[in-house]
Amino acid sequence: MNKLIRLLSVVLAVAMLLGCTAVAEAAPRAINAYKAPADISIDGELTEWNTTSAATINVEEQVVRDPGQWKEKGAEDLSLDVYVMWDEENLYLGAKILDDTPFMYREGFPPDMADSLVLFLSTDPSADAARTAYTANDWRVTMVIDDYYYNTGIDRDMIEDNKGFDTVGEDGDEQVLDGYEACIVEIDGGYTLELVIPWTCLSGAEIPVFAPAAGMTVSVDFGMFDLDFPCPGVATVRMQWAGTDTVDTDPSKWGSMTFCE
């Protein structure tokens, strides 16, 4: 009898362990955005950042375009950790990016065909995380990383009712974010990056300026395009935190971000 009880205990323990593993694997992607220090300096260094919570993009399953190009070198070709900070006026993005051919851009290349970071963000904490269509408070922001112009764009073509805020910067040759700042520092195999996006850039006449507060949770995702040679027709790898390019039209595929002190 005692042997049977011990056997059942082992079986139950294994079942519980497997159950916990399954839950962990199915858990949605989530990160924290920490309150920025009052004296933050945008210099490309990440020394002021809390890097305990990152959106990590570094595996083959996250390559959603031209995977053959990425497989040749793997994470050395492109991989990144993205961090987020905030205050009442700005959203801050920091990143450590490995890229063996960084800062590739050519005039006339759209952001999706150049080296560019992409932010997917909801500015409506009350939005249903399971929604499958963009609303006016859902944003796809492109930021070209070329070590010179740092052009930006906002894609709104997928929104049925955009509340008067149309797509801008789709050609990759404009700076559409008023007050935007960007700075990089080269490191072995890549670079570190700091960006500032004023909350006012993600608002309009019918879209109020977002007012973040500790404890709020919103939908978010991150992606990166990687051009290895600035020539028409060359493959441009795309990696996505979500592991799918359907994030372009379906925010239910995004992860989540909680604002913290």
Residue ranges and their predicted role:
Residues 26-261:
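Structural preference for beta-rich elements and adjacent junctions enriched in aromatics
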Residues 18-28:
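Sec-dependent signal peptide cleavage junction
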Residues 1-11:
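Bacterial N-terminal signal peptides that target proteins for export
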Residues 10-19:
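Bacterial N-terminal signal peptides
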